[in-house]
Structures are given as C-alpha cells and as structure tokens.
Amino acid sequence: MRVVVATGNAGKVREIAEALSELGWQLEGLNGLTLPEETGTTYEENAALKACAAALAKGLPALADDSGLEVAALDGQPGVYSARFGNRPNDTERNLYLLEKLRGVQDRRAKFVSVVMLAYPDGHVETYRGELTGTLLEGPRGENGFGYDPLFVPDGETRTLAEMTVAEKRTISHRGRALAALLATHRNGPPPRETVRTE
C-alpha cells in the first residue's frame, strides 16, 4: 500500500518507515504539498488536519501525528502548543522557558503524548495514541533527540531521552507506542473500520 507521510520532517519520515517496515508499505513524503496550519485544540484535531488534507490532495492514505509535552504543575501545558511554547524560536529557548516556569516547583511530573492518524481519501480515519510518563529535570542532559528530550527522564529510567540512542528511544517513546499500535492493527491486513487504539 502506498501511504503519504504528512510531515515536512525527513527524519520523522525515516522514523515512521523504520517502525512500520514489516508492513511493506511504500511511504512517500509530501513532495511539495503544503499542509494546513495546526489550528486544533487537541492532538487528534491537529493530526486530522494534516492527515485528511494530505489524503484528499494525494488520493492516497496519509499518516500524520501530533504530539506534545504535558506538565502536571502547569495544568497540562504546553500540550498541543509544545512546538510554539512561549513563542520561543527553537528547542533550546523553549527548554529554558519551561525551566523558568518550573523554577522552585517540586512536582516535576510530565508526560509526552502522541496521536498518530491514518486517513483515507474516502474520509475514513484510524487513530492511535501513545503516552510516556516521566519527570522533568532542573537542567538539560544529553545530546541526542530533540525538543524537550534533554529534560525528560521516563519512569523507570535514569537517563533522559536525549541520553538514549535513537533505537532505545523508539522502543519506549510516545510516538513509538502509537506506531506499535498501528503496526499491531495492520499486521494481518487492513482492520475493520472505526479503529482507535491506545498503547
């Protein structure tokens, strides 16, 4: 099956391709297609905006995800606004802004959430959700990964996501869990309609 990956991030296309390799799908990028702005207030809405637009424009199934970091002490912020948190221009600045917001805060619990959506040109969608709980440090550690990875230690681990290899991170990450649910659903062929899975 040919599937469009609705992202401009080549690294994300590779990550998805590796996670779903056993399905034998032919994954392709956007090839110049511009996606709509993420205006949703939930991960599901933002993933749907991208996946449905790509599926309609390309006439093929399309896969998109939206993800974010939810911090308990900040009432779930930054959430769907994680990539734009504090209007900071890059990951380093967003991490510094988050640390400032958490200065003196004892409750450092947080979770990463990812919603992966597979949309078809006929309007059918499948939704898969993955979560990873953990704790935020008071300063960054590690050089791998991106986003808030240098601050986030998953429950049961001593290293941040940025201190793990890509392969290690993929096995436990929120996106990895959502993609694993999609893989499990499609392993034996297309699933029944109205599929929603959570791992």
Swiss-Prot record:
Cellular compartments per GO CC: cytosol
CDD domains reported for this sequence: HAM1
Active site (record annotation): D66
Cofactor notes: Binds 1 Mg(2+) ion per subunit.
Family: Belongs to the HAM1 NTPase family.
UniProt-recorded name of the protein: dITP/XTP pyrophosphatase
Swiss-Prot/TrEMBL cofactor(s): Mg(2+)
